[in-house]
């Protein structure tokens, strides 16, 4: 992985305007921006920084694992001959990080009238990932939902993807990325550390 991503030190900035989507008032939340993400949170600044660093590392690894999904390989071939054409259309990915599960549930209750029991959610229509701070952190959920986000926003956008079939592939690859683990200046993916991946292995082998 690009070693610079391990040195990333994003700075939280107290927002000066009302947040259009959550209705958080000015000065009541923070924005943490990285090269590829904007994280908005009403939690402690350190919480925003923590997830910002993690999703940037995920982004770096995701790009390397799934290069043919997001990259124009014909342009990549031209790059080796000196071309400077962009490999893909860069986008900024939006994440809302609530300070607690109660805040998270309250947000969806106000918007939909329904009680939400999930621990994280990527909304393809709004192009936002919705997450919340917990102790211990639900890092696997962050990795899972942002993986959905990257596939949808950087690949061919298919309306209602997996609504009728192939949900196993969509959820399977997100679960695979839950196994993302950092080891100093390198990472691993696909190891036994992923709790939910063990159920898939069990069903395959037993």
Please identify what each model-predicted range represents:
Residues 1-139, 163:
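Non-catalytic architectural context of zinc metalloproteases
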Residues 126-205:
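Zinc-dependent metallopeptidase catalytic helix centered on the HExxH motif
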């Amino acid at each position: 992985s690009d070693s610079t991503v391990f040195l990333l030190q994003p700075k939280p900035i107290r927002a000066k305007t009302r947040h259009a989507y959550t209705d958080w008032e000015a000065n009541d939340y923070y924005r943490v921006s990285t090269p590829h993400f904007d994280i908005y949170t009403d939690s402690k600044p350190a919480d925003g920084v923590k997830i910002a660093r993690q999703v940037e590392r995920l982004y770096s690894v995701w790009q390397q694992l799934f290069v043919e999904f997001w990259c124009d390989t014909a342009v990549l071939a031209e790059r080796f001959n000196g071309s400077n054409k962009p490999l893909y259309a860069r986008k900024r990915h939006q994440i809302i990080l609530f300070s607690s599960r109660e805040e998270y549930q309250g947000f969806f209750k106000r918007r939909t009238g329904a009680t939400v029991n999930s621990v994280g959610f990527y909304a393809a229509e709004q192009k936002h990932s919705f997450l919340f701070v917990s102790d211990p952190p639900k890092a696997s959920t962050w990795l899972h939902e942002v993986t959905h986000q990257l596939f949808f926003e950087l690949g061919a956008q298919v309306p209602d993807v997996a609504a009728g079939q192939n949900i196993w592939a969509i959820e399977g690859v997100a679960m695979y990325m839950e196994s993302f683990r950092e080891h100093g200046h390198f990472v691993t993916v696909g190891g036994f550390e992923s709790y939910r991946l063990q159920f898939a292995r069990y069903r395959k082998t037993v």
